[in-house]
Amino acid sequence: METMRDIKRRINSIKNTQKITKAMKMVAAAKLKKAQLKAENARPFFEKTRSILIDVARRTRQKDIHPLLREKENNRSLFVMITADRGLCGAYNARVIDRVKKLTEKEDEVNFLAVGRKGRDFFGKRGYNIISEYINIDDYPDYSLAGKIGEEIISLFLDDVVDRVVLVYTYFNSAISQEVRDLTLLPLTPPDDKNQEEGKINTEYLYEPSPEAVMDILLPSYIKNILYSALIEAKASEFGARMTAMDAATDNAGELIDKLTLSYNRARQAAITKEITEIVGGAEALK
């Protein structure tokens, strides 16, 4: 049975931990606000690029296929996975890793481009080929990082090092809801024209010097836009997951402190009762 001193030591230790988790929750909440704003501001730009790609792809569909759209015969896959550099964010990293494990089960040859330390460490320690890694990512990634990653995977695809590129990341819905998503980056499949299916009128654009020339610039840009969107969505999701996890940890610490305080008070009451009983017993013996 624990002594009063042991219980008191545990209470103080948990209180110190609670201070840390509460501080981490507040920091994550502050970072989340800015990251969420960046993610929401980037979505309209991404959607506009997407709509232009739909229109250009529709005009060039009957012509020579672009190298970034061409499917290959082999099955050498590159998985671009975005995880966090640190833990203490609930199941955020585990969900991404689980999705990647499921996607790679039936792959012939698997390679990784790891964004974030946690994903790199998990698959690197298990003998997988990490072609490239990006760690110590800023809290608010800029477009240059997406551009660098985009150039690398486009080069790997065009040089026939890999035949398919799959992106796995976490989409931010809210502070308590994040969704792991995966999509094939290369060969790139132009998104469907949903407006056309619904009978809506599309704006006609004139592309100079030609739709094909625009496609040469637009496709790499579209890939980089997807990556940038994924990076900032993932960061917002990480902060949301960490804030939620630290909030739960703070609450759990409070509950444990209450239980231990109750145990301490009971032990103290028992000790006082025992001491009083001994005093009364001694007094009776002296009579």
Curated annotation (Swiss-Prot):
One GO cellular component term: proton-transporting ATP synthase complex
Q: Where in the cell is it found?
A: Cell membrane
Q: What is its main location?
A: membrane
Keywords, comma-separated and alphabetical: ATP synthesis, Cell membrane, CF(1), Hydrogen ion transport, Ion transport, Membrane, Transport
Q: What role is this protein assigned?
A: Produces ATP from ADP in the presence of a proton gradient across the membrane. The gamma chain is believed to be important in regulating ATPase activity and the flow of protons through the CF(0) complex.
User: A single GO molecular function, which one?
Assistant: proton-transporting ATP synthase activity, rotational mechanism
Organism for this UniProt entry: Halothermothrix orenii (strain H 168 / OCM 544 / DSM 9562)
InterPro entries the UniProt entry points to? ATP_synth_F1_ATPase_gsu, ATP_synth_F1_gsu, ATP_synth_F1_gsu_CS
Q: Which PANTHER family match?
A: ATP SYNTHASE GAMMA CHAIN, ATP SYNTHASE SUBUNIT GAMMA, MITOCHONDRIAL
**Key word Ligase present:** no
Swiss-Prot/TrEMBL GO biological process terms: proton motive force-driven plasma membrane ATP synthesis
- Membrane topology of the entry: Peripheral membrane protein
What HAMAP family does this protein's entry cite?
ATP_synth_gamma_bact (MF_00815)
Kindly provide the name given to this protein in its UniProt entry.
ATP synthase gamma chain
Q: How does this polypeptide assemble, per the annotation?
A: F-type ATPases have 2 components, CF(1) - the catalytic core - and CF(0) - the membrane proton channel. CF(1) has five subunits: alpha(3), beta(3), gamma(1), delta(1), epsilon(1). CF(0) has three main subunits: a, b and c.
Do you know which Gene3D superfamilies this protein is assigned to? 3.40.1380.10, ATP synthase, gamma subunit, helix hairpin domain
Report the family membership: Belongs to the ATPase gamma chain family.
Q: Give any Pfam family that matches.
A: ATP-synt
